[in-house]
Curated annotation (Swiss-Prot):
The keyword Ligase applies. Its main location: cytoplasm. GO terms for molecular function: ATP binding; UDP-N-acetylmuramate-L-alanine ligase activity. The keyword Cell wall biogenesis/degradation applies. It comes from Chlorobium phaeobacteroides (strain DSM 266 / SMG 266 / 2430). This is UDP-N-acetylmuramate--L-alanine ligase. Cell wall formation.
């Protein structure tokens, strides 16, 4: 793979899921990669081991003699000293999505979009193609144990990636197959209205060439609204609404799911997933429909889905003992994702006590969706809400907005046990004392709440295995 005379790439915010995936692909393709992030961790350590030069914090001199600087939509260019230094030095500065668009020019692109389920569905399609011997190149915004990372550079023609709607990033991509998993209100700071968001998805879908295909889930009302505006071939999938590819006979048993797929007038029973939840069945349908379009034999699709082993931070079980006590870590941060994670726990472990530990993500999202979070958390037996993970936002810009809004919303929705605990150590101590019997402790959020799940799992492993 060549990008003109480019030999060295500097990535600002290299520790992020999407940025680290680009870094891994560039490293594997022989490019020199440097990068900076405010904090270090497992992701930056892995990149360093693969040959990247990683800096903690941002400094102008770290740009060095890079040929191009890449940054994510979460970065404010005018406030970043590295980007300013690059511009002053005449070094091209581009967003992540533009780099992705360039990388796609060398491959047959399978792009997975949607408000929810992008990472899991992308990983399912990747696993299916690898098991079918297609050797795809894969870029996922998360870490897959099966893939041993977030990126695989294959020798085949397919490039399978997530297509993120944030900041209209996916409109830079040129998919041959465009998957639309789900669609509802999200990123209103970018779009303003659901109508504008829907228009963006229509534009993304219609970028598919005449020989490509759009694969979309008709269980979402907003997707049903966009279908009449598609001017490309499309395949539908769903569970509740009539569709070209459907699931039935679903059985949930702990962290496993079984179901039958109906497609093209045929039935394929006994499809098995090693992940729980109705939402994962839906993700598998998207992968199944994609496989059929790519000409993969149904039995090989099913074999690939069976090999899918989940993603880190997607209902990741970090601790499980013989007494039925589990620690689960999940990336859920939108109300629909939170609801799906709680439902997966409730359906898979119907006799267990479900303890939900939720960290809201972004002040703007918490303010907009507080009531929806209340309803989403309602099926948990105990609910503990941490303070908000701010990410790119500042608390001073959102006076009066805190995790207490979510706890209050749970009570408003009829929940009896919901508590806001801002102090992180107190939150940990409270959760640690919860299990008295079969219990699923479900940590949810896109921020640093994951560290508490790791700490709790580690402590219980040491405590109960001693």
């Amino acid at each position: 793979m060549e990008l003109g005379k480019t030999k060295s790439v500097h990535i600002v915010g290299i520790g992020g899921a999407g940025m680290s995936a680009i870094a891994e692909l560039l490293l594997t393709s022989g490019f020199g990669v440097t990068g900076s992030d405010l904090s270090s961790g497992e992701v930056t350590e892995r990149l360093s081991e693969r040959g990247a030069v990683i800096y903690q914090g941002h400094k102008a001199e770290q740009v060095g003699e890079s040929d191009v600087v890449v940054y994510s939509s979460a970065i404010r260019p005018a406030e970043n000293v590295e980007i300013v230094a690059a511009e002053q030095a005449g070094i091209p500065v581009i967003k992540r999505d533009e780099m992705l668009g360039e990388l796609m020019r060398y491959n047959y692109g399978v792009c997975v979009s949607g408000t929810h389920g992008k990472t899991t569905t992308t990983a399912m399609i990747a696993t299916m193609l690898i098991e079918a011997g297609e050797s795809p190149t894969v870029m996922i915004g998360g870490v897959s144990d099966y893939l041993k990372g977030s990126t695989v550079v294959g020798s085949g023609k397919y490039l399978v990636i997530e297509a993120d709607e944030f900041d209209r990033a996916f409109l830079k991509l040129t998919p041959t197959i465009a998957v639309i998993n789900s669609l509802e209100s999200e990123h209103m700071d970018t779009y303003g209205t659901i109508e504008e968001l829907r228009k963006a998805f229509i534009a993304f879908a219609n970028k598919v060439p005449f020989y490509g295909r759009v694969i979309c889930c008709v269980d979402w009302p907003e997707i049903r609204k966009l279908i009449p505006h598609l001017n490309r071939r499309y395949t539908t999938f769903g569970i509740d609404e009539p569709a070209d590819v459907m699931a039935s006979d679903m059985v949930m048993d702990k962290n496993r799911s079984r179901f039958t797929v109906r497609a093209s007038g045929k039935e394929y029973p006994g499809v098995s997933l090693n992940v729980p939840g109705r939402h994962n069945v839906m993700n598998a349908l998207a992968a199944f429909a994609s496989g059929l379009e790519l000409g993969i034999a149904p039995e090989r699709i099913i074999a690939g889905l069976t090999r899918y082993s989940g993603m880190r931070r997607r209902f990741q079980i970090k601790y499980d003992n013989s007494a039925g006590v589990l620690v689960v870590d999940d990336y859920a941060h939108h109300p629909s994702e939170v609801k799906a994670a709680v439902k997966a726990a409730r359906d898979g472990w119907p006799n267990a006590e479900i303890v939900a530990v939720f960290q809201p993500h972004l002040f703007s999202r918490t303010r907009e969706f507080a009531d929806e979070y209340g309803w989403a958390l309602l099926r948990a037996d105990k609910i503990y809400v941490a303070d908000i993970y701010p990410s790119r936002e500042k608390a001073a810009d959102y006076p009066g907005v805190s995790g207490s809004l979510v706890a209050a919303a749970v009570h408003k929705a009829g929940g009896k046990h919901a508590e806001f605990i801002a102090d992180r150590e107190l939150l940990y101590q409270t959760v640690e004392t919860c299990p008295q019997k079969s219990t699923v402790v479900l940590f949810m959020g896109a921020g640093d709440i994951t560290h508490l799940s790791t700490r709790l799992a580690g402590e219980w492993i040491n405590k109960f295995s001693a």
